[in-house]
Amino acid sequence: MNRLSGFTLVEMLITVAVVATLLTIGIPSFRYVTNSNRIAAEINGLLGDMQFARSEAIKEGQPVTVCVSAGGAACDNTNTWQSGWIVFSDVNGNAAVDAGDVILRIQKPFSSTDTFVATNAVGAVTFNREGYANGIANGTLIALHDSTNTHNWTRCLSINLVGMMQSLTYGTVNGVTCN
């Protein structure tokens, strides 16, 4: 007996309906995951560079600065960290790239439209040879908001005077408010 193989119209319609249902359920969840991962990568990038700067300052016994820099060669006079930043050995500790200072890392501007703004107009953080953060108010926050500016995605980087840092989600944690 010669039987033809293939799908019937009913089987095909059921398959299409199942796939459409799964996509309808899955796409919003996927968007949530991609937004969450993008925000986490952005905040962790700055946190990692701040921790690197602090450890380099302690290791080398001289100040190391992290500052906003769109061009990657000098510090900008702004507190909008989404435009990029640099980490450099700051021999005289003046939070400016001078002769003799060595740029250790460069972070390019965000490709997203997320905003990353520091409280107290902090555009540079200098860690001294003991690892303390100079030039900031205690509890300085650098807040990261996604382009929709919803609280679901808000993350903050908290830095205190002794150089301790923590990444926070929206709300109040250990007396520090991230909003």
Regions from the PLM with identified roles:
Residues 2, 21, 25-41, 45-51, ...:
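N-terminal helix-rich module
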Residues 17-18:
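Residues within membrane-spanning alpha-helices of integral membrane proteins
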Residues 1-9:
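N-terminal leader/signal peptides at the extreme start of proteins
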